[in-house]
Amino acid sequence: MWGGILLLGVSGIYNIILANSKPVDLILQVHVDPPPPCSVTGSSVDFQTVNINDINGSNYRKDAGYTLSCPDRKADDLRMQLRGNTTTINGEKVVDVGGPGFGIRIENADNNSLFSIGENNWTPFNITSQPKLNAVPVKQSGAQLSGADFSGSLTMVVDYQ
């Protein structure tokens, strides 16, 4: 019995509020910051001449040696993405250099772990501790490589977190 009376009372209050409602204009403003104004320099790795038989995923490891500068950024917490043509070597996504069974593995220099490449892979970082990257030639297990010149490239994208 009490439940029915309470429900009826709430219903009556709702109708009173609804009868006295007044439309109000709501103004929403959104400010979207542009991407941070960053520049990247010194981002070229030249392996020079390597011996095909010595390519094992750790020989010929080189520092990617880039410098990232974002002087007019609005925040210190950024994120990085590497984009480019990739291939899969021994189950890992690496930079495609145009040779079958051959690629360049991008690594976190701190622990030589694979650095994720691709449009869905963002790595958060603070401008004071930027990711250090290595590049190392890799070949598919059992691949027979021929001598040739190879090259590959990546695009570094930096944005706010």
What is each residue range found by the language model?
Residues 1-9:
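Sec-dependent signal peptide recognition
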